[in-house]
C-alpha cells in the first residue's frame, strides 16, 4: 500500500512538472470584483507573482466580474516571457472625484517583453466626469517600452482622454478592438502611436470625439487596415512640429478603411515653426460617407483653427511623397480635397489617383471641389479648384511609391511568436493549490499510469 501511495505521489509530481503553468486569477489574491471595492492591490500582487515566475505567465481577469481599479502601473521586466493577460471581465476607473494618484494615465504597462492582452473583456474609463475639466486628464491605457506587444478583442469605453497610447514600442499588433466614446467628448482619441516602429492596427471599430487613430512623431513602418471610423476626426498623421519640435514620420500605409460622418478622413496636420518630415505615406482604398474634410493636408494647424494661424514662420515640417488613391464616397462640404502648405516649405510629390468624391448635399453626383496652396505633385483626375497638381495619366511614380510604402509597412512581423495560452482541458484543485492540464496526451498518459499502479 505504501508503495502504491509513493507511486501516486510521484505520478502527481511528474504531472505537475509537465503541465503546471504560471496562470493566476486575480481573485486568488483577494480581488472582490463587485465594481465598488478597490481591487488595485490584489491586481498588483497577482502581477508581481506572474511577472516573477518562470515560463509563460498568465494573468487572468475572470468573466462575470467587475473590478474597480485606481491608477496602476504594471512594471517589467518580467522573468516570465511572454506574459499573457486574459481579459474576460470588466475594469472600471473611479470617477474624477474619487480618483487617487497619477493623472497622466489610469493603467500603465511598462518595460515588458512579449506582452499579450486578449479577451472579450471591457475597459471603462468612466470619462464623463472628466470631460468638462480644463486641466490634465488621464489616458485610459498606456504602453511604454513594450516590445512584441499584442492587444486584441477588448472593448474600450469612455476614456477621460485618449483610450490607448503606444509609446517607445517596437513590433506591436492591435486588432479587433471596439472603442467607443460620445462624439462630443473632447480629445478622446481611439489609438495614439508615438516614438514607435513596426506597428500593425487592423480590423477595429472606433467611434470617438477626436482622432480615431493618430500617428505622432518618431514613428515608422505603420500599417493600418480594416478600420471603421466614425464619429470622430478620422485617421491623422500628427499633429507634428508643435513648439518647434523636430518631427519624423515615415512609411505609413492606411488601407481599406471606412469613414462615416467624421470631421476628417485622411489628414496630415503640422504646426508652423516645427521641422523634420512626414514622408512615404499612403492612403488607399478609402470609403467616405458624409465626411466633412475627406482629404486634408494642413501645415498651418493651430490646435484646430488653421484659418486663424497668424504665426506663420519660416520653418515647417516637410510633407512629401504622399499618395491618396482609390477614394470613393461623399463629402459633407463642397471641398473633397484641401491642401494648405507653407510657402517656405511647400508640400512636394503629392499624388491623387482613382478617386470619386461627390458632395453629399447635392444629391446629383456633383464632384466635390478642391483647394490648394503651395503644393507640387500630380493627379489622374481633374478636381475643380485643384490646379496646383499637374494633370497626368502617367502615374508610374505614384504607383511605385504606393507599392513601396505599403510593402514596407506590411512586412512588419513580430520577432518572437507569442501565441495565446489555451484554456486548460482539466483542472485539479486541493488545499489551495491548482493543477492545470493543457495537453490531452499528457492527461491520457497520466490516467493510464495511475490505473496501472492501482491495478497492481
Curated annotation (Swiss-Prot):
The secretion signal range is 1-23
- UniProt catalytic activity: (1,4-alpha-D-galacturonosyl)n+m + H2O = (1,4-alpha-D-galacturonosyl)n + (1,4-alpha-D-galacturonosyl)m
SMART domains named among the record's database cross-references: PbH1
Annotated GO CC locations = extracellular region; plant-type cell wall
Q: Where in the cell is it found?
A: Secreted, Cell wall
Task: Tell me its EC number(s), please.
Answer: 3.2.1.15
GO MF: polygalacturonase activity
Species per Swiss-Prot/TrEMBL record: Arabidopsis thaliana
According to its UniProt record, which residues of this chain constitute the active site? 210 (proton donor), 233
Q: Which family does it belong to?
A: Belongs to the glycosyl hydrolase 28 family.
> Keywords assigned by UniProt?
Cell wall, Cell wall biogenesis/degradation, Glycosidase, Hydrolase, Repeat, Secreted, Signal
Name the principal localization, coarsely classed: secreted
InterPro entries, per the entry: Glyco_hydro_28 (IPR000743), PbH1 (IPR006626), Pectin_lyas_fold (IPR012334), Pectin_lyase_fold/virulence (IPR011050)
Gene Ontology biological process: carbohydrate metabolic process; cell wall organization
Give the PROSITE patterns listed for this entry: POLYGALACTURONASE (PS00502)
The protein's name: Probable polygalacturonase At3g15720
Instruction: List residue spans for each PbH1 repeat.
Output: 169-195, 196-217, 219-239, 249-270, 278-299, 314-341
Pfam families in the cross-refs: Glyco_hydro_28
